[in-house]
Design a protein with these regions (language model features):
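Catalytic Tyr-X3-Lys loop
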Residues: 1-11, 32, 49, 56, ...
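Active-site helix of classical SDR
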Residues: 14, 52, 60
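Alpha-helical segment proximal to the catalytic Tyr-Lys
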Residues: 19, 65-69, 128
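Residue(s) in the substrate-gating loop at a strand-loop-helix junction
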Residues: 36
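Active-site loop immediately N-terminal to the catalytic Tyr-X3-Lys motif
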Residues: 41-47, 69-70, 107, 125
Length: 144
């Protein structure tokens, strides 16, 4: 299930989007994949999820290089835990919440706005020289 959702879907959608971008007279564009901080670091008990997010990061790098000559940029946004209803459910487990927050030097989870702002930046002309990389929104987790 996670492989289909996190990797195959991203690959298939990107392929369709690239075909549309190549037909567009303006040429070029920006593809933004959703990854996770766990595409940059491992976490016990999350092996399949880690694998799929590392896969998205690899896909992004490969496509970023391959499509650069077509003026198509490919990047990822890789957040930590984001304040959503799903994360709120996870955080009802006090041990899990403490473990997660203790790994985030800033001591808080990301907001939906934090993620949306990064996506808007990558989609904008301000990011015209950024491709094949990831913006990690994790409060310092992966910097440790």
């Amino acid at each position: 299930y996670l492989v289909d959702l996190n990797m195959k879907a991203a690959f298939n959608v990107a392929q369709l989007v690239v075909l549309k971008m190549l037909k567009n007279k303006k040429k070029g564009g920006s593809i933004i994949n959703m990854s996770s901080q766990l595409g940059h670091v491992g976490m016990s008990g999350r092996n399949i999820y880690n694998m799929t997010k590392f896969g998205i990061e690899g896909l992004t790098k490969g496509m970023g290089v391959e499509l650069a000559t077509k003026n198509i940029r490919v990047n990822t946004v890789a957040p930590t835990f984001v304040e959503t209803p799903m994360v709120k459910k996870f955080f009802k487990n006090k041990k899990f919440k403490q473990l997660a927050l203790s790994n985030i030097p800033m001591g808080k989870v990301a907001t939906e706005s934090d993620v949306a702002t990064a996506v808007c930046f990558l989609a904008s002309d301000a990011a015209s020289m950024i491709t094949g990389t990831s913006i990690v929104i994790d409060g310092g987790w992966t910097a440790k």
